[in-house]
Amino acid sequence: MMDFLSKTPEPPYYAVIFSSVKSENDTGYGETAERMVSLAADQPGFLGVESVREADGRGITVSYWDSMDAINHWRHHTEHQAAKEKGRSVWYESYAVRVAKVDRQRLFQENTND
């Protein structure tokens, strides 16, 4: 399960936290979400992403970036902007975006060499 956790560098770096509640109309959502992760991964400064979604539509995605410039570049990417507009008009009942600077981290992995 450790592969779920992004392999981030030593801080400092930045986290963009996207919390959302999906609407019932999610036609095309899965494909677009996968495309956005793939596209983000190709952007300068992208460090990783972790995402979960509950059956009731609640979800959270945390993406990690090396700078605010990288975040702003991604934020203004044309295809990302189109996906955000579709999210507001069709896919989400509500969402929140928060940006935080990561100043320290602690990682743990159970020893599985027994």
Swiss-Prot record:
Occurrences of domain ABM (ranges): 13-99
Highest taxon, organism lineage: Bacteria
InterPro entries, sorted: ABM_dom, Dimeric_a/b-barrel, Jasmonate_Hydroxylase-like
Bridged cysteine pairs (disulfide): none
A UniProt-annotated Pfam family: ABM
Listed Gene3D superfamilies: 3.30.70.100
PANTHER family xrefs: ABM DOMAIN-CONTAINING PROTEIN, BLL5343 PROTEIN
Record-given protein name: Uncharacterized protein YqjZ
